[in-house]
């Protein structure tokens, strides 16, 4: 039966979610931006500077500083190569210049979805002792995300080229990439 747990181990143990955080960031972005294809979001150097020297995975959003990117391009930039830069730009935009406002929305949504052991401290998943979730809570978050527009489409994308870019973004999800996934590739993922 769909939705039935087949096996679980330590489903309620707190863990650091790392880049799976971006699933909640996706949720908040899609729920707060009405027109993903036409909403232009300014790319500010000050937002990207926060990620310097963090070892962050990036999606080359910096190439657009001083210009704008569409919300949909930023969502692909966040989800396909796990771009922390795109996550921060979306959070800054929706939080009206304050990423903490965005993180508050993330935590409110987690509660609304019935998450009992989740607390977010940032939109990108960089380590913070106060940034945690459980497998059970992440299941609730992901199950909800799958009901939202374009989530499945974006997360099943292996390469994507943003408007105005020459270089394609490449997925970090080896489960779906037959060319780069090697032993991790799973054709039914």
Where are these regions (language model features)?
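Active-site-adjacent loops and short helices of periplasmic peptidoglycan-processing enzymes
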Residues: 1-136, 145-146
């Amino acid at each position: 039966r769909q939705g039935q747990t087949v096996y679980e181990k330590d489903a309620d143990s707190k863990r650091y979610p790392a880049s799976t955080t971006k699933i909640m960031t996706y949720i908040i972005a899609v729920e707060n931006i009405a027109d993903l294809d036409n909403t232009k979001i300014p790319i500010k150097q000050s937002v990207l500077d926060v990620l310097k020297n963090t070892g962050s995975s990036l999606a080359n959003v910096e190439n657009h500083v001083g210009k704008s990117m569409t919300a949909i391009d930023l969502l692909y930039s966040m989800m396909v190569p796990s771009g922390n830069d795109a996550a921060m730009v979306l959070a800054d935009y929706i939080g009206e210049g304050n990423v903490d406002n965005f993180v508050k929305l993330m935590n409110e949504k987690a509660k609304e979805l019935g998450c009992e052991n989740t607390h977010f401290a940032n939109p990108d998943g960089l380590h913070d002792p106060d940034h945690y979730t459980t497998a059970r809570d992440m299941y609730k978050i992901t199950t909800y995300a799958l009901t939202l527009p374009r989530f499945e489409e974006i997360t099943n994308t292996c390469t994507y080229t943003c408007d105005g870019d020459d270089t394609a973004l490449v997925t970090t999800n080896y489960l779906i990439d037959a060319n780069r996934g090697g032993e991790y590739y799973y054709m039914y993922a």
